[in-house]
Amino acid sequence: MALTIDELKIQIQSDEHRQLELKKTTGELKDGMHSACAFLNTEGGWLIFGVAPKSLKIQGQQVTDNTQREIAQALSYMEPQVDVRVEYIDIPDRPDHKVIAMHFDGWAWGMVPYTYHGCPYYKVESTTKEMPRDMYEERLRRS
């Protein structure tokens, strides 16, 4: 499910929504992981770093070994563990910058709800919220 730069441009045309979260850089990695957890507990979606949320401008960022380690470390705090492919998309007019994209599959009844650092999240429209305890416990009972 590799995303090209042209597909990315189409994807972000409609601004952030229930299945799309944009972050300017991985400096917002923790907030991004809250959204990733919420995607896993709702309908799934894309988490994209390197796109300004307000202007929708594709800026990208420099990606180092340290950047990749930070992403891997952040993903390791997800419970249960997730196997997500992290895509690094080249930006034609900025050769030293990449957009970082991750797709998370949605939740289905019977699955254990996901947590990030022990806290479950879910999506309400384009907003990421902590999952209410009763909703979390109901999902645990049905898993």
Predicted features by range, described:
Residues 1-143:
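Conserved N-terminal catalytic/coupling substructures associated with nucleotide/phosphate chemistry
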